[in-house]
């Protein structure tokens, strides 16, 4: 067995089990998505009924049907601002991902480095991002750059914390085995620690990409002339509440879509981990 095979075995990777039947897989997807869809339809139905029965004014609480109508009528306006927000989220998330993985790798090198750096990482999250955003506008000016930084600041923390935990979760016996096989520190990191930490990294990335949407909106609230956050701020004084809700709907859809995309990359990158989880679930159900 070569070093790569030993590393894969040490990292807990097993031969890929046979895929489930396609009809069973489709049934499983339907069963998984049916409850949330039913709850969403129920909430929207109750919301619509409440507004209609009690004749609630549109500027106070628009009905879902009015929000959908606004989404259609203002499709061009919403799409234009959505493009800006998506750009801010993707670039800021990419910055957070790169910085988070590098910082986590440095922190995981030794306990001394962890004790020196980790307190500052935690302290960075105690400062409200709404306070930092105006300072970035003063230092950098208007434009997309401050929004990128705001998104990165709000998204990098879960990536760092989860990746550090993943890098430190390696079995010491596996490390000793690789050293016995002649692997150096770099080989141990690339072939053992990094593969082992990927499930943790993707867990942090899914959280990070969801909160990245919040970071983009906060940046647009503080100072911007484009984006869904700016559109919401501009619509509020005009009592265009239905447009605010339409923007919220688009933001929610954006967050869910990005979360699902990261999950898809996760399944393609570490199929062995998902197979192991699936087998554990099957054993638990049986």
Positions of the model-derived regions?
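Transmembrane-helix boundary motif in ABC transporter permease subunits
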Residues: 92-121, 138
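Membrane-spanning helices that line or support transport/gating and their immediate boundary helices
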Residues: 49-52, 105, 112-119, 162, ...
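C-terminal transmembrane helix and the adjacent membrane-cytosol boundary/short C-terminal tail
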Residues: 111, 168, 199, 246-286
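Generic hydrophobic transmembrane alpha-helix motif, especially the helices
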Residues: 122-158, 165-166
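N-terminal signal-anchor/first transmembrane alpha helix
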Residues: 20-51
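Short helix-to-coil transition segments within interhelical loops
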Residues: 167-173, 177-197, 226, 237
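Transmembrane alpha-helices
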Residues: 149-153, 185-219, 251
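Periplasmic/extracellular loop-to-transmembrane helix junction in inner-membrane transport proteins
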Residues: 16-26, 52-97
């Amino acid at each position: 067995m070569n070093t790569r095979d030993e590393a894969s075995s040490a990292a807990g990777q097993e031969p890929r089990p046979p895929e489930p039947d396609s009809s069973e897989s489709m049934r499983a997807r339907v069963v998984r998505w049916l409850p949330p869809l039913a709850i969403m339809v129920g909430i929207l139905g109750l919301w619509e009924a409440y507004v209609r029965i009690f004749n609630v004014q549109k500027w106070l609480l628009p009905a879902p049907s009015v929000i959908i109508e606004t989404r259609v009528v203002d499709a061009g306006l919403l799409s234009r601002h959505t493009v800006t927000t998506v750009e801010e989220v993707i670039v800021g998330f990419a910055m957070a991902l790169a910085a988070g993985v590098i910082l986590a790798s440095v922190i995981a090198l030794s306990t001394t480095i962890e004790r020196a750096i980790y307190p500052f990482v935690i302290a960075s999250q105690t400062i409200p991002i709404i306070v930092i955003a105006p300072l970035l506008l003063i230092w950098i000016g208007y434009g997309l750059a401050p929004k990128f930084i705001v998104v990165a600041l709000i998204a990098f923390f879960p990536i760092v914390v989860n990746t550090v935990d993943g890098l430190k979760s390696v079995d010491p016996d596996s490390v000793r085995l690789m050293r016995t096989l002649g692997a150096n520190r770099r080989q141990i990191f690339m072939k053992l620690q990094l593969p082992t930490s990927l499930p943790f990294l993707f867990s942090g990335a899914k959280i990070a990409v969801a909160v990245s949407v919040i970071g983009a909106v906060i940046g647009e609230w503080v100072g911007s002339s484009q984006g869904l956050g700016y559109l919401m701020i501009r619509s509020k004084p005009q009592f265009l509440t239905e447009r605010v809700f339409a923007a919220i709907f688009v933001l929610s859809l954006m967050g869910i879509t990005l979360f699902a995309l990261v999950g898809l990359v996760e399944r393609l990158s570490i199929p062995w981990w998902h197979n192991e989880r699936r087998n554990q679930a099957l054993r638990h159900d049986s």
